[in-house]
């Protein structure tokens, strides 16, 4: 603390009254020697007596040294019960100095890493988590211990318990923790939530990360981990447009751009997922922005596929499968396939969705160029049955992608949007004015011609 002040457990700031450094300098080597001779209990009693004096005098440095010495001697003697007992005792002493407890906990955290016996390690972690609970000044140490415990639980196959333990931490509120470490903790929470298929909690946790953080230096690994986790989350949600955006973020990462194979795979995924996304203004805008990427020249098949969806022409599904099916699903030596249309249940579902996007594209083209069309003719153009065509059409109308009215008895679809009466009247008035102006001009020209001919 500033000006030699120390903070007690009750929050009071106190100044050192007596400096016990010379006494501690003398006693600690003596105690260490006695501890090695097997007189540990006697040594601890001596140090606890000295600790009371230093604590009462608010000598933070000396108190810290004594607390660290006690746990160190217990650790070196492998007296695990005594170690846990003294950690609890020293942290709960009346008016204990916060900085001294923090030093002791930090020392014990190094022992957690060194201990190989699992039951002993778990007991020490539990003790340390107990003494650090609710104490802001050791919140970072508690977070690290909790992460270690979660890792052990996961390694033992108890992933659900690991996720539950790590979710206790609200690291986004830890002001003393570095931003990078906070993000690492949150990503680990996301990973474990996904592992136990807790997608709602994963979505909530993901919002704790501000993506602007990834613009900072040395954050590329964390950025890739974050977006890969988000892709897994949105795969479950079936949000293709979000997945496309995540792949774009991966594609724009310098370490991905540096390797041709990696950026090509990322760009292929960007193209495929933007095509798979249902049509709306945002999707349309993204398609045109992606189309402008010059690097698409290096993956021509994917560039041509994207162009099909921006060209105002009908597509035949059978032709698309013939031209692009092998490239998209199996790939080639020069251009490996992505996992988008892999031989999995999800891959098959996305392949079916691609066919749906082709049908929807074709219906939008018809709505653009036709005012009316029969159901049979539309089904013929779509290579579908009449019922399937009607189902697709209904879906697009419900989503307000197009406007259409179906006369079931006549079997005719009308794509022409009914005009507002006011607009209709305004159009009629404008056209009538235009016609009358034309008649007046024509009359004037005729009169002019007659006058010229009369003069002659």
Curated annotation (Swiss-Prot):
Residues bearing PTM N-acetylalanine: 2
N6-acetyllysine carried by residues: 221, 368
Annotated GO CC locations: cytoplasm; proteasome accessory complex; proteasome regulatory particle, lid subcomplex
Bridged cysteine pairs (disulfide): none
Keywords assigned by UniProt, alphabetized: Acetylation, Isopeptide bond, Proteasome, Ubl conjugation
Crosslink position(s): Glycyl lysine isopeptide (Lys-Gly) (interchain with G-Cter in SUMO1): 92
Glycyl lysine isopeptide (Lys-Gly) (interchain with G-Cter in SUMO2), cross-linked positions: 92
Gene3D superfamilies hit by this protein: Winged helix-like DNA-binding domain superfamily/Winged helix DNA-binding domain
Pfam family of the protein (one): RPN5_C
Domain spans labelled PCI: 242-420
PROSITE patterns registered for this protein in UniProt: PCI
Subunit structure: Component of the 19S proteasome regulatory particle complex. The 26S proteasome consists of a 20S core particle (CP) and two 19S regulatory subunits (RP). The regulatory particle is made of a lid composed of 9 subunits including PSMD12, a base containing 6 ATPases and few additional components. Interacts with ERCC6.
Family stated for the protein in its record: Belongs to the proteasome subunit p55 family.
Role description: Component of the 26S proteasome, a multiprotein complex involved in the ATP-dependent degradation of ubiquitinated proteins. This complex plays a key role in the maintenance of protein homeostasis by removing misfolded or damaged proteins, which could impair cellular functions, and by removing proteins whose functions are no longer required. Therefore, the proteasome participates in numerous cellular processes, including cell cycle progression, apoptosis, or DNA damage repair.
Protein's name in the database: 26S proteasome non-ATPase regulatory subunit 12
């Amino acid at each position: 603390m500033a000006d030699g002040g120390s903070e007690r457990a009750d929050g009071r700031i106190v100044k050192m009254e007596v400096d016990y450094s010379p006494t501690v300098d003398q006693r600690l080597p003596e105690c260490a020697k006695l501890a090695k001779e097997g007189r540990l209990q006697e040594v601890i009693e001596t140090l606890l007596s000295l600790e009371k004096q230093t604590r009462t005098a608010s000598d933070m440095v000396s108190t810290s040294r004594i607390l660290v010495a006690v746990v160190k001697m217990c650790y070196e003697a492998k007296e695990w019960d005594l170690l846990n007992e003294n950690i609890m005792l020293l942290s709960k002493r009346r008016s204990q100095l916060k900085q001294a407890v923090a030093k002791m906990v930090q020392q014990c955290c190094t022992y957690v890493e060194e201990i190989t016996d699992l039951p002993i390690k778990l007991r020490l972690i539990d003790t340390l988590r107990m003494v650090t609970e609710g104490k802001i000044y050791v919140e970072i140490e508690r977070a690290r211990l909790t992460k270690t415990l979660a890792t052990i639980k996961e390694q033992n196959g108890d992933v659900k318990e690991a996720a539950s333990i790590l979710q206790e931490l609200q690291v986004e509120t830890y002001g003393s923790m570095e931003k990078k470490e906070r993000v690492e903790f949150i990503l680990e929470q996301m990973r474990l939530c996904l592992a136990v298929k807790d997608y709602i909690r994963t979505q909530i946790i993901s919002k704790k990360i501000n993506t602007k953080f990834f613009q900072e230096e040395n954050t590329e690994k964390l950025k890739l981990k974050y977006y890969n986790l988000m892709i897994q989350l949105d795969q479950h949600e079936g949000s293709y447009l979000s997945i496309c955006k995540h792949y774009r973020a991966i594609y724009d990462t310098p370490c991905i751009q540096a390797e041709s194979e990696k950026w090509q795979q990322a760009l292929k995924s960007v193209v495929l997922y933007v095509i798979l996304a249902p049509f709306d203004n945002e999707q349309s805008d993204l398609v045109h922005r992606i189309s402008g990427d010059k690097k698409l020249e290096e993956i021509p098949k994917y560039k041509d596929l994207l162009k099909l969806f921006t060209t105002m022409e009908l597509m035949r599904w059978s032709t698309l499968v013939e031209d692009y099916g092998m490239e998209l699903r199996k790939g080639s030596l020069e251009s490996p396939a992505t996992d988008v249309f892999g031989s999995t249940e999800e891959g098959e579902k996305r392949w079916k969705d691609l066919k749906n996007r082709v049908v929807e594209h074709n219906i939008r083209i018809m709505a653009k160029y036709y005012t009316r069309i029969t159901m049979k003719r539309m089904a013929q153009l779509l290579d579908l049955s009449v019922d399937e065509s009607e189902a697709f059409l209904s879906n697009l109308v419900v989503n307000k992608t197009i406007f259409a009215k179906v006369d079931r008895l006549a079997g005719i679809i009308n794509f022409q949007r009914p005009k507002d009466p006011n607009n209709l009247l305004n159009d009629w008035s404008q056209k009538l004015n235009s016609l009358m102006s034309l008649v007046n001009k024509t009359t004037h020209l005729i009169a002019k011609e007659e006058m010229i001919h009369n003069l002659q």
